[in-house]
Amino acid sequence: MVQGREGTFITGISMGGMGSLRMAVKYPEVFQAVASQEPAVEPALAYDDITLRDRIGRPDGAGLEDRILLKRIYGDPIDKDYWAANHPAAIIKKDPSRLLGLGIYLEVGDQDLFYIDQGTEFVHRVLFDAGISHEYRLVKGADHVGASLVPRSLDAFAFIGRQLKPPKWIDDTVLRFRATADENKKARGYPVTPFDPNRIHAQ
């Protein structure tokens, strides 16, 4: 059993993708990285912004079992603050700086039958706009189920492997090239941003 954050990873697919992402962004001090595949996350920051399309494949309260499940989880009426406190995108938006140093991998198929590509893209945009470095893949021609999940899962595990043993992609050659490019940027009045593996460089 690994003790401490380093070497502690969490991953999952679909509902498990949402759960793993939620756990990682709620408790980034616990995990070194998360690999979330096709996470069942609604593209919204508030419960009232969820659309009919976003409810496909999820409990929507239409049937008795759904109503019981929603009441058990979120209360009756829905506790919207509690919902936001457990929604990955809303958690990220509230305080993105907590995620600096957390390895984050998101992926989804662009043919997802539950439209989960919409929610995954939404989470990606929240992270991107906050300047939090992460890896995101929209897999061309892939659905929520099927043969694509095998290579996609291997890609997710490869990401985890890179967190265990980070490749030296920014080597001396790259640093020299960056230094030359930075001088050119300065001369032309462009902003210069230093290399930071935790932030998107343009932020």
Say what each PLM segment does.
Residues 1-203:
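Non-catalytic cap/lid and distal C-terminal segments of serine-dependent acyl enzymes
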